């Protein structure tokens, strides 16, 4: 389920006033597990007709506000529990991205675990396109980005 880095990934160092982590993706749609943090992976892959067929995908950020392409947080665990009780665990990569192609029974619940703390999503979901609500501009009642627990 998790990622492997490939050669040719491009990131740039930016001021922390621009991106909290000080890193930003700078390679456009160059195929990589680190690409386009914060953007809607599932919608893009369907629209472009290429890339893995993710069932759940998103990015974990240090806080609720972050611009698209800013790197998120590496090493957080995203736990998706399907309606059947099966847990699917994903660890965020260097860009904060997580994803899976496994079938997940909906509605599912979600939580983020990091350094002994958890943040729980309160409402069960049927879409795995996390950034469709947790985007640069939050929608559908989301408070903002998927953020680390406080």
List where the protein language model places each region:
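C-terminal motif of bacterial Sec signal peptides marking the signal peptidase cleavage site
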Residues: 2-4
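The canonical Cys-X-X-Cys-His
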Residues: 37-48, 127-138
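Short Pro-Gly-centered beta-turn/loop motif in secreted/extracellular proteins
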Residues: 99-109
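A short, solvent-exposed loop/turn motif at the edges and junctions
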Residues: 110-126
């Amino acid at each position: 389920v998790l990622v492997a880095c490939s050669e040719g990934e491009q990131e740039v160092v930016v001021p922390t006033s621009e991106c909290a982590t000080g890193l930003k993706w700078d390679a456009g749609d160059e195929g990589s597990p680190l690409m386009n943090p914060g953007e809607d992976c599932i919608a893009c892959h369907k629209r472009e007709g290429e890339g893995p067929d993710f069932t759940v995908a998103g990015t974990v950020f240090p806080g609720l506000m972050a611009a698209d392409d800013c790197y998120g947080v590496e090493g957080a665990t995203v736990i998706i529990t399907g309606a059947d009780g099966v847990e699917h665990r994903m660890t965020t990569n260097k860009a904060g991205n997580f994803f899976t192609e496994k079938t997940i029974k909906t509605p599912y619940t979600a939580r983020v675990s990091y350094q002994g703390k958890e943040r729980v999503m309160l409402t069960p979901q049927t879409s795995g396109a996390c950034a469709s609500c947790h985007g640069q501009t939050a929608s559908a009642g989301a408070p903002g980005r998927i953020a680390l627990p406080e």
